Amino acid sequence: MVALDNLTFIAVNFKALYKFLQGMEWNPNCLQRSVQGVLSVLLSLKKNPIIRYQNFSSLARRLAENIRDTILKESSLFHFHRGESIPLLLILDRRCDPITPLLNQWTYQAMVHELLSIKNNRVSLVGVPGAPKDMSEVLLSAEQDEFYANNMYLNFGDIGQTIKSLMDEFQMKAKSHQKVESIADMKAFVENYPQFKKMSGAVTKHVTLVGELSRLVTQHNLLEVSEAEQELACQEEHTQSLTKIRRLLVTDQIRDLDAARLVFLYAIRYHKHQSKDIVGLVDLLRRRGTPVRLIDCVEGILRYASSGETAGSSILTTNDVTKITEKIFKVRATQLMI
């Protein structure tokens, strides 16, 4: 594992993660590497945590037991003072909720990852309409960008309002810098110029990023796609959902990835429904030219979700969250104006 920032760690070898199961049991080598990865994070953070895991999952239990045994065996390495707040290592089995990873994300950081992609804390703006010519790539790091650190978890609507406030503040400071009439004014300008220039760059960067996110949301019809996803995850309207998915799959506006995700969600949600039409939806994916690698995932995702169905069934009958979705998008019109 490597650290992206002080809150985020990722596995280096992603392909290995897909091979850790042998008939829904741990591959011994992958179990060992997973234990080593978690332990390396604990050591880097200087934490000796209490370990909790989901009771239904034998996979989570084995991982927890191996981590505990190693910590006890190497107790001298984990002799850290716990303090008043005891750290907790919580091990969850993704099978209890196969829905959430398939949903489109609507927070600032997640949308940049999903729609623009971040590599080594850098976002490429090559080909982005309206992007400044000298801004082909921007740095997006919580450690070096105060605005990003404070707003990375805001939803799409709120981030638009926040950037508008940043712009208003910048415009006020820009006006004050226009009045350089005395030696004192010149001195103040020189002293504040680095901060002013930094703020100018931050405004330009984030306005450009959010503007591009807004364009992509419209281009790929992500609002309607996300609404269909929420209905699949949280409502009991099979006919309504099936009709909406069929309509979306025959449009060219949505991405192949979003089309496939809708079918994945439908398959997980309604694979036991007497009127299910998974085969028909898969056929629509083929007709629209969806890559075979995505189509082939339908069966695998169903098998994966079914293996944890007993624990995860309650996830699929959550109360309606349409109001939450509406809240996320409520200020989109304002955001598009910045």
Residue spans of the language-model regions?
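Extended, well-folded catalytic/binding cores that form a central cleft or groove in large enzyme
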Residues: 1-338
